[in-house]
Regions:
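Short, flexible, basic/aromatic active-site loop/helix in glycosyltransferases
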Residues: 137-154
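N-proximal low-complexity "stem/linker" segments adjacent to membrane-targeting elements
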Residues: 1-28
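A conserved acidic beta->alpha catalytic loop
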Residues: 25, 40-49, 66
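Conserved donor NDP-sugar-binding/catalytic core segment of glycosyltransferases
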Residues: 96-132, 137-140
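Glycine-rich, basic loop-to-helix element that forms the pyrophosphate-binding segment
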Residues: 63-81, 91
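Short beta-strand/loop segment that forms part of the nucleotide-sugar
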Residues: 33-42, 62-64
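Short alpha-helix within the catalytic core of nucleotide-sugar-dependent glycosyltransferases
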Residues: 23-24, 48-49, 75, 83, ...
Length: 154
């Protein structure tokens, strides 16, 4: 039985340097039924020509003629992409090779799961969680945010 079809969708706006650094990790993902889509949100840098010259055979590129913003860019792209599961990631995301299958298995295991969000590690200090965009976090007694599952040093 084949794995469910997954579309990994990366929204890009002027992030050529980030794509150079992080897209190879996404391409190395160990999963047998996926397509990788980079959606260009009307970039003014050389992102599109870079993608076409370096990754044309490995990815699909959607080019928007206007910057639709973050949600608008993803919505525009998802209207054009067919898959059973969609993974929306930013161009600055580093993933290990085996990251995708556990997410798909979890989603398949419970039809009530509608979205899955990772704990985001700080790229410069991987022992720490990144706060930006954290969902379901807490605020400590001093007003500092922290994510569920964060390990505190004693």
């Amino acid at each position: 039985m084949s794995s469910p079809k997954v579309a990994i969708v990366v929204l890009n706006y002027n992030t050529q340097e980030l794509l150079e650094k992080y897209l190879p990790d996404v391409l190395a993902t160990d999963y047998d039924n996926m397509d990788i889509w980079v959606v260009d949100n009307a970039s003014t840098d050389k992102s599109v020509s870079f993608l076409q010259s370096q990754f044309q055979q490995q990815i699909h590129i959607l080019i928007s003629s206007e910057n639709r913003g973050y949600a608008g860019g993803y919505n525009w792209a998802l209207d054009q992409i067919e898959a059973e599961y969609y993974v929306l990631i930013n161009s600055d995301v580093r993933v290990p090779k085996s990251w995708l299958r556990p997410l798909v298995n979890l989603a398949k295991s419970n039809p009530q799961i509608g979205a899955i969000q990772p704990k985001i590690l700080d790229d410069k200090s991987v022992q720490y969680f990144e706060y930006a965009g954290a969902c379901g976090g807490y605020i400590d007694k001093w007003g500092y945010p922290f994510c569920r599952g964060r390990i505190f040093d004693s």
